[in-house]
């Protein structure tokens, strides 16, 4: 808000599932799973690398997921619809934090290359704000450019 981060959704701990992360989970079921004889490392591996879309479809490649959806694979369609729903819900929650005074909703990373995926999310959230698509991976470049600005004295390091 006004150029500052006011809230985040840490994909390692909460929010929508990802390609290999579980996202937010029902607490009671999670507790039961944790006490089902699994070690701590097994539980962490399951929810941190073998969950999300991977747990349904055996892949972390979103292009493969989309191909299965286009082919009409029922399991892929169901998992895909759950992902879209969860992401739309998270976008709506973040819009609420901003009192729905949102300048834009930005779709980034590799998933933003898929037209129908962006269209499906936009069907839920498109009335909130204009949609901007910036497909591709820019995280490392952005981090490097930010660090360079700090090292050159052009910007102070931010603490979060």
Predicted regions and their residues:
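Active-site proximal loops enriched in glycine and acidic residues that flank catalytic Cys/His/Asp
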Residues: 9, 106-109, 135
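Predominant activation on well-ordered alpha-helical scaffold segments within soluble catalytic domains
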Residues: 27-35, 41-48, 63-66, 88, ...
């Amino acid at each position: 808000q006004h150029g500052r981060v006011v809230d985040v959704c840490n994909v390692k701990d909460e929010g929508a599932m990802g390609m290999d992360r579980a996202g937010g989970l029902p607490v009671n079921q999670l507790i039961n799973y944790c006490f089902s004889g699994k070690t701590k490392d097994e539980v962490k591996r399951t929810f941190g690398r073998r969950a999300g879309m991977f747990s349904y479809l055996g892949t972390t490649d979103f292009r493969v997921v989309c191909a299965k959806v286009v082919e009409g694979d029922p399991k892929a369609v169901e998992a895909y619809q759950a992902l879209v729903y969860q992401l739309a819900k998270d976008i709506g929650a973040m819009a609420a934090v901003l009192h729905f005074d949102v300048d834009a909703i930005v779709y980034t990373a590799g998933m933003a290359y898929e037209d129908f995926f962006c269209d499906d999310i936009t069907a839920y959230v498109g009335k909130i704000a204009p949609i901007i698509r910036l497909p591709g991976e820019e995280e490392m470049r952005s981090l490097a450019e930010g660090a360079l600005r700090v090292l050159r004295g052009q910007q102070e390091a931010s603490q979060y």
